[in-house]
């Protein structure tokens, strides 16, 4: 099993998935602003093929401000100020792996190296966090994690916050590395996200299993 088409292609034919697409399409039709733009909803899968995934960073739902979300969890488009959670990720990276903090929040270089930046819900209405939380996306992303868990081995799952941890509770810890910490949001980062050293631990694990490490440094 090499591609997302192999792993989750059948989901497209399922009634629940048809319902999601129909719902989002309808919302856009009546003039609601939905993020990310239609052509970027599935960017995480386009940028990181199933067989190339090394690390999964699980987010919740997309950023709901203008020009932020582009289909990768925690990432924002070039030219947009990094949001607070990402600022804390950068802080941890700088302490953990000597990361130089860039002026942007565009994480596409991670995705190209095999970091699947996956939100558990893939769309949101402008200004309304979690507005699409119950339209079926969770079923789809559960299937994504299930297939990675089953058909890949020696992946690293970074689960930050209770939502991500609950989502990843069925991951087989004998075949994969699961690292948990509080969410990097300013509300919780000081409770153990800062100092978690997940980025160096990820590379330690990959290296010990003969997998090329992630170069976390982003273009400045």
Swiss-Prot record:
Residues annotated as catalytic: 61 (proton acceptor)
Domain of life: Bacteria
Gene3D superfamilies: Uracil-DNA glycosylase-like domain (3.40.470.10)
Top EC class of this enzyme: hydrolase
CDD domains tied to this protein: UDG-F1-like (cd10027)
Example GO BP: base-excision repair, AP site formation via deaminated base removal
SMART domains named in the record: UDG, UreE_C
Catalysed transformations (reactions): Hydrolyzes single-stranded DNA or mismatched double-stranded DNA and polynucleotides, releasing free uracil
EC number in record: 3.2.2.27
GO MF annotations in UniProt: uracil DNA N-glycosylase activity
Any one GO cellular component localisation term in the record: cytoplasm
Keyword vocabulary terms for this entry: Cytoplasm, DNA damage, DNA repair, Hydrolase
Location in or out of the cell: Cytoplasm
Similarity remark: Belongs to the uracil-DNA glycosylase (UDG) superfamily. UNG family.
HAMAP family in the cross-refs: UDG
Biological function: Excises uracil residues from the DNA which can arise as a result of misincorporation of dUMP residues by DNA polymerase or due to deamination of cytosine.
Protein name, UniProt field: Uracil-DNA glycosylase
């Amino acid at each position: 099993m090499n591609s997302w088409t192999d792993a989750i292609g059948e989901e497209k034919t399922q009634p629940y998935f048809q319902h999601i697409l129909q719902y989002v399409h309808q919302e856009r039709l009546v003039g609601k602003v939905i993020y990310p733009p239609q052509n970027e909803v599935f960017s995480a899968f386009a940028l990181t093929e199933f067989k190339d995934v090394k690390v999964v960073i699980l987010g919740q739902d997309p950023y709901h401000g203008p020009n932020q979300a582009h289909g990768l969890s925690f990432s924002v488009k070039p030219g947009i100020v990094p949001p607070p959670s990402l600022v804390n990720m950068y802080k941890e990276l700088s302490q953990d792996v000597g990361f130089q903090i860039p002026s942007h929040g565009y994480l596409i270089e991670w995705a190209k190296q095999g970091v699947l930046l996956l939100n558990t819900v893939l769309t949101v209405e402008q200004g309304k966090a979690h507005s699409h939380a119950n339209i079926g996306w969770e079923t789809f992303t559960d299937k994504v994690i299930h297939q990675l868990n089953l058909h890949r081995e020696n992946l690293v799952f970074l689960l930050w916050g209770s939502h991500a941890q609950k989502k990843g509770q069925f991951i087989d810890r004998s075949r994969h590395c699961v690292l948990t910490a509080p969410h990097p949001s300013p509300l919780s980062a000081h409770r153990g996200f800062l100092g978690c050293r997940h980025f160096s631990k990820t590379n330690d694990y990959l290296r010990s299993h003969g997998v090329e490490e992630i170069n976390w440094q982003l273009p400045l």
